[in-house]
Amino acid sequence: MSWRGRSTYYWPRPRRYVQPPEMIGPMRPEQFSDEVEPATPEEGEPATQCQDPAAAQEGEDEGASAGQGPKPEAHSQEQGHPQTGCECEDGPDGQEMDPPNPEEVKTPEEGEKQSQC
């Protein structure tokens, strides 16, 4: 008996053809006018007042958190340097521990030889 396993090679799937927007038809701006332009408040109502009480409460919470300082920015800086568990090799201190390049380091004897020529 021979074992017939499933092949690991998969044929590429045919791509579905989608017509470009020019072929479908022009977009009508009046369909999206509510989404594109924000609703303008009436003259009697202030622009910052929300009609939804839950949304108004969220707005107050945002104002309170804004006075606490730049905590999100400080947190984003910490994410810039991921911790790998072995911090001793990472960072600028690890670069100073490398041995100097012998081509860049000149001994006093080499300096004297060049000055004599």
From Swiss-Prot:
Region (Disordered): 1-117
Ranges annotated as biased composition (Acidic residues): 32-45, 87-96
Pfam families, A to Z: GAGE (PF05831)
Basic and acidic residues composition bias: residue spans: 103-117
UniProt xrefs under PANTHER family: G ANTIGEN 1-RELATED, P ANTIGEN FAMILY MEMBER 5-RELATED
Extra information: This gene belongs to a multigene family expressed in a large variety of tumors whereas in normal tissues, expression is restricted to germ cells. These genes organized in clustered repeats, have a high degree of predicted sequence identity, but differ by scattered single nucleotide substitution. Their sequences contain either the antigenic peptide YYWPRPRRY or YRPRPRRY which is recognized by cytotoxic T-cells.
Similarity-based family: Belongs to the GAGE family.
Protein name per Swiss-Prot or TrEMBL: G antigen 12B/C/D/E
Organism: Homo sapiens
Designated gene of the protein: GAGE12B
